[in-house]
Amino acid sequence: MTSTAARAGVNRGASILDFILRIVAFLGTLVSAVTMGTTRERLPFFTQFLQFRAEYDDLPTFTFFVVANSIVCAYLVFSLALSVFHIIRSNAKKSRIILIFFDTAMLALLTAGASAAAAIVYLSHKGNAKANWFAICQQFNSFCERISGSLIGSFVGVVVFILLILLSAAALSRR
């Protein structure tokens, strides 16, 4: 086996790993967006003028989280085509550079959405006595479990995007 053939085999293996990681990130962001987007809870008691409920769209941060995860999820669907192209033609250079650029932009968007939502989830669980923000998770238990769980898939997506960027950079440096 020549050096060029060995390098092509390594690049093909990296491209297959890239494809698998993109599927993992797609599933993580999809589950996160759907879980957060369908999160709502109403408390069984209410007054004549007030009904107690919690929905994801009560907070703009959670709406941003759903939109960010949805955009990244849609991007991942389109990027799967380029990933398949890299499996077929493992020496493609320009398309890998394009993927690194857009992967980095999607990493920034996903990190912003997940981090902002994580701050609100923390406040939901712990509150902030100095600001008179009370923890709501004792009352809205199901709501808090779902919003906390939706963060997992999003942060998995963040880690996978970091790995994808490193993998693409390594594949480019071998040329």
Swiss-Prot record:
It comes from Malus domestica (Apple). Regulates membrane-cell wall junctions and localized cell wall deposition. Required for establishment of the Casparian strip membrane domain (CSD) and the subsequent formation of Casparian strips, a cell wall modification of the root endodermis that determines an apoplastic barrier between the intraorganismal apoplasm and the extraorganismal apoplasm and prevents lateral diffusion. The chain crosses the membrane at residues 16-36, 62-82, 97-117, 151-171. Pfam families: CASP_dom. This is Casparian strip membrane protein 1. Keywords: Cell membrane, Cell wall biogenesis/degradation, Membrane, Transmembrane, Transmembrane helix. NCBIfam families: A_tha_TIGR01569 (TIGR01569). GO terms for cellular component: plasma membrane. InterPro entries: CASP/CASPL, CASP_dom, CASPL. Residues 37-61, 118-150 are extracellular. Homodimer and heterodimers. It is found in: Cell membrane. It comes from the Eukaryota. One of its GO terms (biological process) is cell wall organization. Its main location: membrane. It is a multi-pass membrane protein. Belongs to the Casparian strip membrane proteins (CASP) family. Residues 1-15, 83-96, 172-175 are cytoplasmic.
